[in-house]
Amino acid sequence: MFKYIGDIVKGTGTQLRSLVMVFGHGFRKRDTLQYPEEQVYLPPRYRGRIVLTRDPDGEERCVACNLCAVACPVGCISLQKAETEDGRWYPDFFRINFSRCIFCGLCEEACPTTAIQLTPDFEMAEFKRQDLVYEKEDLLISGPGKNPDYNFYRVAGMAVAGKPKGAAQNEAEPINVKSLLP
């Protein structure tokens, strides 16, 4: 008989404790965000979707050096080099498979021209896996991205057709390294 009374008291105590816990949580701030209306906080260095940028002249920054594809630990980047009449390299095709990408940022670090940049965009959900394979046209943005004044060909010293090195618009004169010696 006393065993049954003890079980009843124990069960009632458990129910009361659960009710107190439920009502206590009802007055606290919620942990869940209503996502589309309330945007998620992203840290300043968040690595999201990859984009290809343009230089200040509006040309593609990518020179198809293939360093990004080599640096990628999962091998989700593929590209093919082509060359213009003036000798400038560009990617004939540039493809990233975002279903395999782990957003590590190694491709951005490996890029000598800052053509590849990671943006804070993370909304890339698709119903088909094939739709997560982005081509160059999908990745190329109209602006220069994080480095608006950088132009690889101005720094690299490639001569512009018809002008000597250092004579093109916004280009610095070449430095004579022998004059810097003591």
Swiss-Prot record:
PROSITE patterns: 4FE4S_FER_1 (PS00198), 4FE4S_FER_2 (PS51379). Binds 2 [4Fe-4S] clusters per subunit. InterPro entries: 4Fe4S_Fe-S-bd, 4Fe4S_Fe_S_CS, NADH_quinone_OxRdtase_chainI. GO terms for cellular component: plasma membrane. [4Fe-4S] cluster 1 binds at residues 62, 65, 68, 111. It is found in: Cell inner membrane. Residues 52-82, 92-121 form the 4Fe-4S ferredoxin-type domain. GO terms for biological process: aerobic respiration. [4Fe-4S] cluster 2 binds at residues 72, 101, 104, 107. One of its GO terms (molecular function) is quinone binding. It comes from the Bacteria. Keywords: 4Fe-4S, Cell inner membrane, Cell membrane, Iron, Iron-sulfur, Membrane, Metal-binding, NAD, Quinone, Repeat, Translocase, Ubiquinone. It catalyses: a quinone + NADH + 5 H(+)(in) = a quinol + NAD(+) + 4 H(+)(out). Its EC number is 7.1.1.-. It is a peripheral membrane protein. Its cofactor is [4Fe-4S] cluster. Pfam families: Fer4_7. Belongs to the complex I 23 kDa subunit family. NDH-1 shuttles electrons from NADH, via FMN and iron-sulfur (Fe-S) centers, to quinones in the respiratory chain. The immediate electron acceptor for the enzyme in this species is believed to be ubiquinone. Couples the redox reaction to proton translocation (for every two electrons transferred, four hydrogen ions are translocated across the cytoplasmic membrane), and thus conserves the redox energy in a proton gradient. NDH-1 is composed of 13 different subunits. Subunits NuoA, H, J, K, L, M, N constitute the membrane sector of the complex. This is NADH-quinone oxidoreductase subunit I. It comes from Pseudomonas fluorescens (strain Pf0-1). The lineage of its organism: Bacteria, Pseudomonadati, Pseudomonadota, Gammaproteobacteria, Pseudomonadales.
